[in-house]
Amino acid sequence: MRIIGIDPGLARVGYGIIDEIEGKKIMIDCGIIETKSTKKEEERLVEISNDLSSIIKKWNPNSAAVEKFFFYRSSTTISVVQARGVIMMTLGKYKLPIQEFPPMQIKLAVTGYGHSDKNEVLNCVMHELSITSPPKPDDAADALAIALTGIYLK
């Protein structure tokens, strides 16, 4: 099984690709899709879709896990929701089964505690994937946690 985990955003979309083979989880790739704030929002959304399509074509995941947006008041809320919509549409275009998880559920699945901090989540991700260096940037590490959640809760 190969899964792509996605941490949505407009400026940066984190992604992480994990294989699960006979119970062992192996990180294949992780990184970010970054868009420039100097571009028009619609151009940034197209860039996210195009770059995500390239990642899907390259790694051919069987499924996807996406962080579910929970509402909070912020000047970027609408932009993030729009980016998430583009991400969901792009995943749908490739007919990938999608699981959605709110942040607390991701923390609970990865660490066993729904109120874990970022460092606790990161340490558990590194341990589970047997990696010695923290994935950078944080968005990529978060995407790996989301992918692991998709594996754990399939």
Swiss-Prot record:
One of its GO terms (biological process) is DNA recombination. GO terms for molecular function: crossover junction DNA endonuclease activity; DNA binding; magnesium ion binding. Gene3D superfamilies: Ribonuclease H-like superfamily/Ribonuclease H (3.30.420.10). InterPro entries: RNaseH-like_sf, RNaseH_sf, X-over_junc_endoDNase_RuvC. Its main location: cytoplasm. It catalyses: Endonucleolytic cleavage at a junction such as a reciprocal single-stranded crossover between two homologous DNA duplexes (Holliday junction). Pfam families: RuvC (PF02075). SUPFAM superfamilies: Ribonuclease H-like. Binds 2 Mg(2+) ion per subunit. It is an enzyme of class 3 (hydrolase). Mg(2+) 1 binds at D7, D139. Disulfide bonds: none annotated. Its EC number is 3.1.21.10. Homodimer which binds Holliday junction (HJ) DNA. The HJ becomes 2-fold symmetrical on binding to RuvC with unstacked arms; it has a different conformation from HJ DNA in complex with RuvA. In the full resolvosome a probable DNA-RuvA(4)-RuvB(12)-RuvC(2) complex forms which resolves the HJ. The RuvA-RuvB-RuvC complex processes Holliday junction (HJ) DNA during genetic recombination and DNA repair. Endonuclease that resolves HJ intermediates. Cleaves cruciform DNA by making single-stranded nicks across the HJ at symmetrical positions within the homologous arms, yielding a 5'-phosphate and a 3'-hydroxyl group; requires a central core of homology in the junction. The consensus cleavage sequence is 5'-(A/T)TT(C/G)-3'. Cleavage occurs on the 3'-side of the TT dinucleotide at the point of strand exchange. Belongs to the RuvC family. This is Crossover junction endodeoxyribonuclease RuvC. The lineage of its organism: Bacteria, Bacillati, Cyanobacteriota, Cyanophyceae, Synechococcales.
